Amino acid sequence: YMISSTKLRKAKKSLEETEPYFNALRNMVSRVVRHLPDVENQYMDVRPNKAPEDRIKGFIVVTADKGLAGAYNHNVLKKAMEEIEQCKNYKLFVVGELGRQYFKKQNIPVAEQFHYTAQNPSLHRARIICEEVVEQFKEGELDEVYVIYTYMKSSISTEVDMINLLPITRDMAMQHEMERQGVFNEEIELQPSPNALLNNIVPDVIMGYI
């Protein structure tokens, strides 16, 4: 479906207002992981003893509710199919009616309880989605969680992107970014503990991505 210029401006304004908060949380996680390499946390559990063929990957696939947006939906669904074809075990969490109907026609199961439209996105809905996948990760029902979506580079340019949400990894790219900003070394003190901090802010970071 066509997106009106008013809706587009509203969406961009909302993104601009929330991005600084989200980036601050994401940077805090990166700083903790960077400065405390020995920290262990439930969200950093890569489950090294689990064989690749036994790992369960969860994919949050974000599509539209209608099919008039051309490549917007096609490219996301194509990327999702490429990923699940390489997996023995996976779960699909589909946002958007078009995506659900597509996988249904392909006889590919999706999480039935995960029934969300793409219309009127909100932080409340993002939190519910986040809680669902985070709980399954903590319970060992998922070993990795990704989100596949359309990244809007500009009002006329988009591309498909896939982000690894869980487990949290030690991303060296963030270290390079901090060095670019002139942050080479710093002392940080975390209260009550690094583990408690990560338990509190990692779900918010994941919700921010969603």
Predicted regions and their residues:
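C-terminal beta-strand-loop-alpha-helix "lid" module of Rossmann-like NAD(P)-dependent dehydrogenases
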Residues: Y1-I210
